[in-house]
Amino acid sequence: MNDFTLNAQARTDLGKGASRRLRHAANIPAVVYGGNKPAESVTILSKEIAKLFENEAAYSHVIELNVDGTKQNVIVKAMQRHPSKQFIMHADFVRVVAGQKLTAIVPVHFVGEDAPVKKGGVVSHTATELEVTCLPKDLPEFIEVDLSAAEIGTIIHLSDLKAPKGVEFVALAHNDDKAVANVHAPRVVAEDEEGETAAE
């Protein structure tokens, strides 16, 4: 299991103007809340948080956040990126309390896609991440979806997945058995449509 750490500094200069000044200085604003403690506004070096989240696993791991020498365990709850440049503009972190269940977003990893593709199928991913609830010690790095037995017409729902021990899918708790992936036949263009296109 990887260890993830991040350094931050407390900030008191708040508001949109302050956030813009932070970004111009190569920092980003962030908020830490939860754990029955007051919310904290902090600032983090842009390059440091960018480097951390180059590793996909950081999104679903407990992170040791060091705020001016005070360490606390957190998970990322939300992240705002620039719409076109994709750099991180703001982050929300939730404190993790040992023995207390947390809710987190975990990436989905698809395996065995070659099997249905070799049979002429086209695989569509309808979910690339899933919301789970579990104790901090049980937080998975990812959820695996095995497509090796899938055929054309197969739809894999959340209820078809085997959750890791101690992990529950939030959507299922709300009776939302959503599709995660499906295999369908390739789209065939009618000959007359092809002819019309060629004529144009």
Curated annotation (Swiss-Prot):
RNA-binding is among the record's keywords: yes
Pfam families: Ribosomal_L25p, Ribosomal_TL5_C
Entry keyword Ligase: no
UniProt GO MF annotations: 5S rRNA binding; structural constituent of ribosome
Superkingdom of the organism of origin: Bacteria
InterPro entries cross-referenced by the UniProt entry: Rbsml_bL25/Gln-tRNA_synth_N (IPR020056), Ribosomal_bL25/Gln-tRNA_synth (IPR011035), Ribosomal_bL25_b-dom (IPR020057), Ribosomal_bL25_C (IPR037121), Ribosomal_bL25_long (IPR001021), Ribosomal_bL25_short (IPR020055), Ribosomal_L25_dom (IPR029751), Ribosomal_uL5_bac-type (IPR020930)
UniProt keywords, alphabetically: Ribonucleoprotein, Ribosomal protein, RNA-binding, rRNA-binding
Any Gene Ontology CC annotation: cytosolic large ribosomal subunit
GO biological process, one term: translation
Function, as annotated: This is one of the proteins that binds to the 5S RNA in the ribosome where it forms part of the central protuberance.
Quaternary structure (record): Part of the 50S ribosomal subunit; part of the 5S rRNA/L5/L18/L25 subcomplex. Contacts the 5S rRNA. Binds to the 5S rRNA independently of L5 and L18.
HAMAP family reported in the protein's UniProt record: Ribosomal_bL25 (MF_01336), Ribosomal_bL25_CTC (MF_01334)
Family: Belongs to the bacterial ribosomal protein bL25 family. CTC subfamily.
Record PANTHER family: RIBOSOMAL PROTEIN L25/GLN-TRNA SYNTHETASE, ANTI-CODON-BINDING DOMAIN-CONTAINING PROTEIN, RIBOSOMAL PROTEIN L25_GLN-TRNA SYNTHETASE, ANTI-CODON-BINDING DOMAIN-CONTAINING PROTEIN
Name of this protein: Large ribosomal subunit protein bL25
Organism, scientific name: Pseudomonas fluorescens (strain SBW25)
Gene: rplY
